[in-house]
């Protein structure tokens, strides 16, 4: 029943030209003593290990087979599930996105691992960048931290000769795109 509802929502997103986003991999409210004391969602969560790949692939395939697979961003919490690479069809650049590191992974190491995995299996240049937890005002500074981490990562690649220094104009444009324009264009704001 849950998957049928998700399919209907996915089709509705496709009809509206919207993007569907899935955050998965968390085990919530694990410390019962603190849960009783402070309530839900107060920082006592863990990275989970779930077998979501088959179910997610079937879900996306069903939408794709019906011609109604909308733009999709997948955010995983467990870094062992970083690699994603199905259902690109050329209609939208980066149609299926590997979302930015979040929760336990929205720190330097987690962000770098996510961007490196994306670079290996996709196009970093099409990445829509950092997300914001709009429920928390304090989450907004992570965009600045993300941009600095992105620039350091790409700068190291240039210093190591992995990106030719003669391509700096393209590199600069890629940084601007990841920091702003890709999201603007992807979400059609």
Give residue ranges: language-model regions:
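Catalytic grooves of carbohydrate-active enzymes
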Residues: 134-135, 139-143
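A generic structural motif
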Residues: 96-106, 129-131, 160-172
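Alpha-helix capping and helix-loop boundary segments enriched in small/acidic/polar residues
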Residues: 46-50, 141, 170
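Mid-to-C-terminal alpha-helical segments outside catalytic/metal-binding sites
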Residues: 124-125, 142-189
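Active-site beta-loop-alpha junctions enriched in small/polar residues
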Residues: 25-29, 77-79, 101-105, 135
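C-terminal catalytic subdomain
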Residues: 91, 105, 109, 137
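Histidine/acidic residue-rich metal-binding segments in metalloenzymes
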Residues: 1-71, 81-95, 113-129, 147-150, ...
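Divalent metal-coordination and catalytic microenvironments
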Residues: 23, 133, 183
